[in-house]
């Protein structure tokens, strides 16, 4: 086989483990791209480039293909995995993070480590669902869910969270209330308190923006590290 040449191989796979579904619509292949490592992707300019990627159809390792011509550093600094969701678990009677099959495949493989080895940070996006949203939580629910996010990031060696307030207009479950920017800001604050050494970022859209008031004496810029627009 030659270097820098793309090959296609027919595959027939026999599973020796459980958890395989004949009705699934995709499979995740992870290539172990060994080679050069970077302690950091930080640029002398201080500029940081975020990539919010759709995980359902794209391998996050494509970010390793883009390098700066002069410095040789990786182009991207932060990869946002879009997206996990906030849902209400009827059996457990609580709000929790739900992973799509694509997200599960990524965080349970060595994809995050490979991106870390290239000096990039990896952040999980948390999107609303039909059951709950990131701008709908009461103070108590914000605190509890923030700890779940912190535990999630710790378990999968992620560098933070990206809150996205879309696709949710229901607040009929316990722990939820009328949505507002103030509710989204409170969740950001509680998340920063739960994981002060990790990133808390927001999509500048809907109610995850327009944070004007202090929370517990803290300015929004003290508990939101980055706000990202299209």
Can you name each region flagged by the protein language model?
Residues 8-14:
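Extracellular recognition modules
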Residues 22-37:
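C-terminal edge beta-strand
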